[in-house]
Amino acid sequence: MAILAFQKPDKVLMLEADSRFGKFEFRPLEPGFGITVGNALRRILLSSLEGFAINTIKIEGVEHEFASVPGVKEDVTNIILNLKQVRFKQVVEEFENEKVSITVENSSEFKAGDISKYLTGFEVLNPELVICHLDSKATMQMDITINKGRGYVPADENREYCTDVNVIPIDSIYTPIRNVKYQVENFRVEQKTDYEKLVLEITTDGSIHPKEALKEAAKILIYHFMLFSDEKITLETSDVDGNEEFDEEVLHMRQLLKTKLVDMDLSVRALNCLKAADVETLGDLVQFNKTDLLKFRNFGKKSLTELDDLLEGLNLSFGTDISKYKLDKE
């Protein structure tokens, strides 16, 4: 079944951008697509991007999160609440987790920036965040573990990383996205005024550029929708390798090559000649070269020119090797 042409943007406009904030514009969109695309991207951005956070802590002399530390104003519960807010950026690609031992002494405040001097693979993005206040003679010894994760993980799920009874699991806020807002506005295309413009604003913690965050969210959505794009939808477990690299261009070409020629508005003569030769889809057609086509019964140069123009308009060409697109002829 042929799909009617959709009004869609040729590209995404980046209206504003720095390391933490980006404003993007998609236009024109069909009526109703603004909220469809905007809401889907917002939910993925807020819940599903990867980041780094503290998942366990150990404070010398403390057995559980409801205890207090001698000489420290805040109790352990409040210290944990503050540690959950510390934001990290990976600076050494090989480091996806790191455990550090921290000693705080001769200081009235323990800030997030004080963790930096103990780190090898990460950078603290909010160094001015105060973790706790100490008396002048107080000393605090703390071990923390930083790891990679997605979205939000509660303390109970981090319990598996506790190596001994005095290690305390904490909630981990991995998402690098601080806020996402979108709005849908009317947009005019020629004489029609009911098209839409989607304006998307993304605020990150600085560990990822807003443009990269948007790209990652789009890839996650496309990867999931790809499961519904095949003509074969079954109740069986998929055999697709979960680690297989996903290529948007390959997916687009794969779907294009599956298009049936009967839906391409060809002349009856050309269509009948191709049908007689069992050439039913664009994928079947592009595998032939022009010489082979002219050998088909009743196939002439006029039909060849018609097909040549068709493929040129779709950025396809004769004699194409389509094996990498893994098409299954049904």
UniProtKB/Swiss-Prot annotation:
UniProt keywords (A-Z) are: DNA-directed RNA polymerase, Nucleotidyltransferase, Transcription, Transferase
A GO molecular-function descriptor: protein dimerization activity
Q: Which GO terms describe its biological process?
A: DNA-templated transcription
Record-listed E.C. numbers: 2.7.7.6
Pfam family name, one? RNA_pol_A_bac
Task: Cite the InterPro entries for this sequence.
Answer: DNA-dir_RNA_pol_insert, DNA-dir_RNA_pol_RpoA/D/Rpb3, DNA-dir_RpoA, RBP11-like, RNAP_asu_C, RNApol_insert_sf
SMART domains recorded for this chain?
Answer: RPOLD
Query: Which reaction does this enzyme catalyse, per its entry?
Result: RNA(n) + a ribonucleoside 5'-triphosphate = RNA(n+1) + diphosphate
Mind telling me which SUPFAM superfamilies this protein's record contains? C-terminal domain of RNA polymerase alpha subunit, Insert subdomain of RNA polymerase alpha subunit, RBP11-like subunits of RNA polymerase
Which GO CC terms are listed, alphabetically?
cytoplasm; DNA-directed RNA polymerase complex
Outline the segment boundaries, as ranges, of region: Alpha N-terminal domain (alpha-NTD). 1-231
Residue segments, region Alpha C-terminal domain (alpha-CTD): 253-330
Relate the assembly described in the record: Homodimer. The RNAP catalytic core consists of 2 alpha, 1 beta, 1 beta' and 1 omega subunit. When a sigma factor is associated with the core the holoenzyme is formed, which can initiate transcription.
The cross-references to NCBIfam families, in alphabetical order and at most eight, read: PRK05182.1-2, PRK05182.2-2, PRK05182.2-5, rpoA
The domain comment in this protein's record states:
The N-terminal domain is essential for RNAP assembly and basal transcription, whereas the C-terminal domain is involved in interaction with transcriptional regulators and with upstream promoter elements.
Q: Which function does this protein serve?
A: DNA-dependent RNA polymerase catalyzes the transcription of DNA into RNA using the four ribonucleoside triphosphates as substrates.
Family listed: Belongs to the RNA polymerase alpha chain family.
Q: What protein am I looking at?
A: DNA-directed RNA polymerase subunit alpha
**Which source organism does the UniProt entry give?**
Phocaeicola vulgatus (strain ATCC 8482 / DSM 1447 / JCM 5826 / CCUG 4940 / NBRC 14291 / NCTC 11154)
Q: Which gene encodes it?
A: rpoA
